[in-house]
């Protein structure tokens, strides 16, 4: 069950006439510092400070192989390709992402339920959690396009109706992330400022934005100010490594013009105490395979 935005205060205005920077109104780490869990106190402090937490090996090499095979099966299945949950690369016409992968695949559903994964999300968010979004991402070599700078929360707030910043994402590498093959970049500390973007949200904006971000894109001036203040960190790591990052981190990735493909599993956990209401700055909700309306906790 959802409510309308008339009952919820909009703490983070966006998609108006001008770009507006708003100081973060929410904690980063919602759980108690001494609560038991797989994340150490030092790592929780680093997450609070930087907005992200890198783990050298979250899953084993054998597990990486299992998930690689499942990714290959899904991305070569004609039925999956024809499904609206699959997003196709504009140039190559190859599958770029498959959404709601934890519902399509029992292999990835088990990963979501793994305590190494969901246990960290519960500890950070201080509550039970549900999956707001899941997907596999494939960035083939020789020209796969990147994704421009953005805050995920800006979109999830504006178009999905998440009221507060009580959401955490994990990107688990299924291939090696080099410093050359279009890896994830984050501005450390940027999660402490919400950059509300200028411009109204078109109807069915999601159809375009999943291939190339437009609405919800920060200005050059806003990005320059943030990058000058916070810097930019590029994430590299072996297959099986993972990056946890706060929903409001300013992040993006470049094109992959190398021969080396890059693929990952991306899971977004939201607190059951922060369930979606009506969109704060969009005419309609996005489809449920992008922004979940099933708030059943992961068990």
Curated annotation (Swiss-Prot):
Lineage: Bacteria, Bacillati, Actinomycetota, Actinomycetes, Kitasatosporales
Record has Iron as a keyword: yes
pH dependence as annotated: Optimum pH is 7.5.
Site entry: Important for ectoine stabilization: 156
Subunit structure: Homodimer.
Residues that bind Fe cation: 150, 152, 251
Residues at which L-ectoine binds: 133
Cofactor note (record): Binds 1 Fe(2+) ion.
Residues reported to bind 2-oxoglutarate: 139
NCBIfam families: ectoine_ThpD (TIGR02408)
Origin: domain of life: Bacteria
SUPFAM superfamilies, sorted: Clavaminate synthase-like
GO MF annotations in UniProt: 2-oxoglutarate-dependent dioxygenase activity; iron ion binding
Protein name: Ectoine dioxygenase
Family according to the record: Belongs to the PhyH family. EctD subfamily.
UniProt cofactor(s): Fe(2+)
């Amino acid at each position: 069950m959802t409510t309308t935005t008339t009952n919820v205060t909009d703490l983070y205005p966006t998609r108006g006439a001008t770009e507006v920077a708003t100081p973060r109104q929410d904690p980063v780490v919602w759980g108690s510092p001494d609560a038991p869990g797989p994340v150490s106190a030092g790592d929780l402090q680093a997450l609070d400070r930087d907005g992200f937490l890198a783990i050298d090996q979250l899953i084993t090499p054998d597990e990486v192989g299992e998930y690689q095979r499942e990714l290959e099966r899904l991305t070569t299945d004609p039925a999956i390709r024809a499904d609206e949950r699959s997003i196709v690369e504009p140039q190559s016409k190859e599958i770029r992402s498959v959404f709601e992968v934890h519902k399509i695949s029992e292999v990835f559903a088990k990963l979501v339920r793994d305590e190494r994964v969901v246990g960290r999300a519960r500890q950070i968010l201080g509550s039970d959690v549900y999956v707001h979004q899941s997907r596999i991402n494939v960035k083939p070599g020789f020209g796969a396009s990147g994704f421009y700078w953005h805050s995920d929360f800006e979109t999830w707030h504006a178009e999905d109706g998440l009221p507060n910043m009580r959401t955490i994402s994990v990107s688990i590498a299924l291939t090696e992330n080099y410093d050359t093959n279009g890896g994830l970049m984050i501005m450390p500390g940027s999660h402490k400022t919400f950059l509300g973007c200028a411009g109204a949200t078109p109807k069915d904006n999601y159809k375009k934005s999943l291939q190339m971000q437009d609405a919800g894109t920060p200005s050059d001036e806003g990005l320059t100010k943030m990058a000058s203040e916070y810097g930019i960190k590029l994430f590299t790591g072996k297959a099986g490594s993972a990056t946890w990052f706060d929903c409001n981190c300013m992040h993006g990735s470049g094109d992959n013009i190398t021969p080396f493909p890059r693929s990952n599993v991306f899971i977004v956990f939201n607190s059951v105490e922060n369930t979606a209401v009506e969109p704060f700055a969009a005419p309609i909700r996005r489809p449920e395979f992008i922004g979940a309306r099933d708030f059943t906790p992961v068990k």
